[in-house]
Amino acid sequence: MTSERNTDIEIRLLIEAIYLKYSYDFRNYSGASIKRRILHALRQFDCLTVSALQERVLHDPGMFMQLLQYLTIPVSEMFRDPDHFLAVRNEVVPLLRTWPSIKVWIAGCSTGEEVYSMAILLREEGLLERTIIYATDINPHSLDRAKQGIYSMQSMREYEENYRLAGGRRDFAEYYTAAYGNAIMDSSLRDNVTFADHSLATDSVFSETQLVSCRNVLIYFNKDLQDRALGLFHESLCHRGFLVLGSKESVDFSAYSDRFEPLVKPQRIFRKS
């Protein structure tokens, strides 16, 4: 048996052990993606084998929380793919206005950049006051960072261009306070935001929504888990609600391909049919 085959077996055992011990379910994540992340963590933790990593993770919850940062890839940016946000502003917002109150679910919100981007967009369109945003993720460390809303000033300078290209209407600096090399987001942007732990692999729907945003998350799932997540989104959305996905994601070829219709297909914006 080759060493690579041994490693694949060890990874399956580690993923199963994490599920049994900590109830985090990575069993239906993309095999190639999860393997790449675990092998990267292996080098960072100076473990010779995945089995050695498993022993440390099982007996040290702190080590598991460190590993979780590698497994969940907490990387995001504000107004990522500006054309997407411009399409939401121009094509989705006019239709959202027809509802007296709006609920938005941002699934896999990571460290919150997408949440603040959506809140800024909705504020500029006069909808934030009557909107509740549910921001969910499986990584508690990422959720804590999202709640704090503190980002590096270097990042904010990069996000400013995204904001402008996404149709931003104000001075981006109005939305944060600069302090010691960081940007602290205006706390009023999260007045109507509920941050919550939620797993697309194991949890169920918790509210009816008009808009679900889950961008650059499904690409890390296998087909079964993609279908499960799309099922949750379909169940959550009200009649004619909106689903927005990442640039490399689609409902095509899924079990729910006939239950959504494209609204702005190049920007991966769909509507429940």
Swiss-Prot record:
Positions with a binding annotation for S-adenosyl-L-methionine: S76, R80, E114, D137, S199, L200, R215, N216
Disruption phenotype: Mutation does not affect chemotaxis and biofilm formation.
PANTHER family: CHEMOTAXIS PROTEIN, CHEMOTAXIS PROTEIN METHYLTRANSFERASE
Name of the protein this chain belongs to: Putative methyltransferase Cher3
GO terms for biological process, alphabetical: methylation
Residue ranges constituting the CheR-type methyltransferase domain according to the UniProt record: 1-273
Database matches in SMART domains: MeTrc
Signal peptide residues on this chain, from the entry's feature table: none
Domain of life according to the entry: Bacteria
UniProt KW keywords: Methyltransferase, S-adenosyl-L-methionine, Transferase
Organism whose genome encodes this protein: Pseudomonas putida (strain ATCC 47054 / DSM 6125 / CFBP 8728 / NCIMB 11950 / KT2440)
Transmembrane segments: none
GO molecular function: S-adenosylmethionine-dependent methyltransferase activity
Disulfide cross-links: none
